Amino acid sequence: MLEHHVNHALVTLLSDFGDRDVYVAVMKGVIAQVNPKLQVVDLMHQVPAQDIAVARFCLMNAYPYFPQGTVHLGVVDPGVGSQRKAIAVKFAGGFLVGPDNGIFSGVLAQNPAITSVELTNSQYWRTSQPSKTFHGRDIFAPVAAHLASGVSIQQLGQEIDPRSLVKLNVKQCNQTKTGVAGCIQYIDHFGNLVSNIPESYVQAKKWCVQISGVMIPGCETYSDVPFGDAIALVGSHGWVEIAVNGGNAHLQMHINFYDQLEVLFLHKNQNALA
């Protein structure tokens, strides 16, 4: 274990590894081998397998709540072992470590990269001959631990132009003649259907959502509709979402990731169900 100057920095973990296998625990073990005093926080490990867009969304919505200098480790890596770069990025709020596949593009759209490097210095890897299928263990976890322990980002490898980093081509909402068209970009544990339409589009407006031929009223709280009814509202992360009061919108409405929807703007006296 190398000597470091920082003992109590924070590392977050995000992956599509789930909780059935040992992969997450193995990465935590590698981090502890580098520096057992580091704090490790699980963001989530239930990202749908190989779904970089969902990983991007989750990290983008989580990172603002962590202290300055936090190292965010993201491993949703369908291209593991290929020519895709392994990277570390410094931005205003901390650091990002993982594959260069667009997983960090949501964060970097809000906070541009200050410094980015390709992880070419194997001194900071677990082994100089990493597995072709588990860079999370052999490259990303140890690099994140060293970075959180005070190693400068420049020591980790060759500096690269931040403009060269992969930007994920995610679906954007767009204005229509009657409102805003978008899609479902995330489904949470409660079955709430989170769209890619930000709160700013519906502020100070009367609105509803149309999806799969169903009109759903836009409200402020779950209790604004009867128990068991569908509702559209702005969720805690600032996106228009669809829920069922006391129920599971995903299961009850049979709506899935990337299904299309439209926010419709209503006249002051117009009913959403009219």
Regions found by a protein language model. Give the residues of each.
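Pepsin/retropepsin-fold aspartyl endopeptidases
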Residues: N248-A274
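A conserved acidic, glycine/proline-rich C-terminal tail/linker
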Residues: V194-H254
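Structural motif
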Residues: A9-T12, L38-V41, T70-L73, A86-A88, ...
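Active-site histidine-anchored catalytic micro-motif
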Residues: V34-K37, V54, P67-G69, G74-V75, ...
